[in-house]
């Protein structure tokens, strides 16, 4: 491969960087597909409505049950909950 000629001032020019055609080509635009399954989509929407109605009732019941369970659970980290200072005094009075 022949070297580039040195210019009059003696400095060598840098070779231009070349890229392959594959890398320099612009990426293909994304294809936008039309949705031809409109009839199938309508069927799915009607099915979803039926399922949602069924789920709403179940969720409401589950939420009530969950609320009851959380109130009955002891304190976190194994600590006992103190219900009120008055109840502790009553326990001490009974033990005397």
UniProtKB/Swiss-Prot annotation:
<comment type="subunit">
    <text>Interacts with transcriptional regulator SEHBP.</text>
</comment>
<dbReference type="GO" id="GO:0005634">
    <property type="term" value="C:nucleus"/>
</dbReference>
<keyword id="KW-0963">Cytoplasm</keyword>
<dbReference type="GO" id="GO:0031492">
    <property type="term" value="F:nucleosomal DNA binding"/>
</dbReference>
<dbReference type="GO" id="GO:0001674">
    <property type="term" value="C:female germ cell nucleus"/>
</dbReference>
<feature type="modified residue" description="ADP-ribosylserine; alternate">
    <location>
        <position position="24"/>
    </location>
</feature>
<feature type="modified residue" description="Phosphoserine">
    <location>
        <position position="87"/>
    </location>
</feature>
<keyword id="KW-0013">ADP-ribosylation</keyword>
<keyword id="KW-0007">Acetylation</keyword>
<dbReference type="GO" id="GO:0010225">
    <property type="term" value="P:response to UV-C"/>
</dbReference>
<comment type="function">
    <text>Binds to the inner side of the nucleosomal DNA thus altering the interaction between the DNA and the histone octamer. May be involved in the process which maintains transcribable genes in a unique chromatin conformation. Inhibits the phosphorylation of nucleosomal histones H3 and H2A by RPS6KA5/MSK1 and RPS6KA3/RSK2.</text>
</comment>
<feature type="modified residue" description="Phosphoserine">
    <location>
        <position position="95"/>
    </location>
</feature>
<dbReference type="GO" id="GO:0006357">
    <property type="term" value="P:regulation of transcription by RNA polymerase II"/>
</dbReference>
<dbReference type="Pfam" id="PF01101">
    <property type="entry name" value="HMG14_17"/>
</dbReference>
<dbReference type="GO" id="GO:0050678">
    <property type="term" value="P:regulation of epithelial cell proliferation"/>
</dbReference>
<feature type="modified residue" description="N6-acetyllysine">
    <location>
        <position position="26"/>
    </location>
</feature>
<feature type="modified residue" description="N6-acetyllysine">
    <location>
        <position position="13"/>
    </location>
</feature>
<protein>
    <recommendedName>
        <fullName>Non-histone chromosomal protein HMG-14</fullName>
    </recommendedName>
</protein>
<dbReference type="GO" id="GO:0006325">
    <property type="term" value="P:chromatin organization"/>
</dbReference>
<dbReference type="GO" id="GO:0006283">
    <property type="term" value="P:transcription-coupled nucleotide-excision repair"/>
</dbReference>
<dbReference type="GO" id="GO:0000785">
    <property type="term" value="C:chromatin"/>
</dbReference>
<feature type="modified residue" description="Phosphoserine; by RPS6KA5">
    <location>
        <position position="7"/>
    </location>
</feature>
<feature type="region of interest" description="Disordered">
    <location>
        <begin position="1"/>
        <end position="96"/>
    </location>
</feature>
<feature type="modified residue" description="Phosphothreonine">
    <location>
        <position position="80"/>
    </location>
</feature>
<keyword id="KW-0238">DNA-binding</keyword>
<dbReference type="InterPro" id="IPR000079">
    <property type="entry name" value="HMGN_fam"/>
</dbReference>
<keyword id="KW-0597">Phosphoprotein</keyword>
<feature type="modified residue" description="Phosphoserine; by RPS6KA5">
    <location>
        <position position="20"/>
    </location>
</feature>
<dbReference type="GO" id="GO:0000720">
    <property type="term" value="P:pyrimidine dimer repair by nucleotide-excision repair"/>
</dbReference>
<dbReference type="GO" id="GO:0040034">
    <property type="term" value="P:regulation of development, heterochronic"/>
</dbReference>
<dbReference type="GO" id="GO:0005654">
    <property type="term" value="C:nucleoplasm"/>
</dbReference>
<feature type="compositionally biased region" description="Basic and acidic residues">
    <location>
        <begin position="32"/>
        <end position="50"/>
    </location>
</feature>
<dbReference type="GO" id="GO:0003682">
    <property type="term" value="F:chromatin binding"/>
</dbReference>
<keyword id="KW-0539">Nucleus</keyword>
<feature type="modified residue" description="Phosphoserine; alternate; by RPS6KA5">
    <location>
        <position position="24"/>
    </location>
</feature>
<dbReference type="GO" id="GO:0005737">
    <property type="term" value="C:cytoplasm"/>
</dbReference>
<comment type="similarity">
    <text>Belongs to the HMGN family.</text>
</comment>
<dbReference type="GO" id="GO:0048597">
    <property type="term" value="P:post-embryonic camera-type eye morphogenesis"/>
</dbReference>
<dbReference type="GO" id="GO:0010224">
    <property type="term" value="P:response to UV-B"/>
</dbReference>
<feature type="modified residue" description="Phosphoserine">
    <location>
        <position position="84"/>
    </location>
</feature>
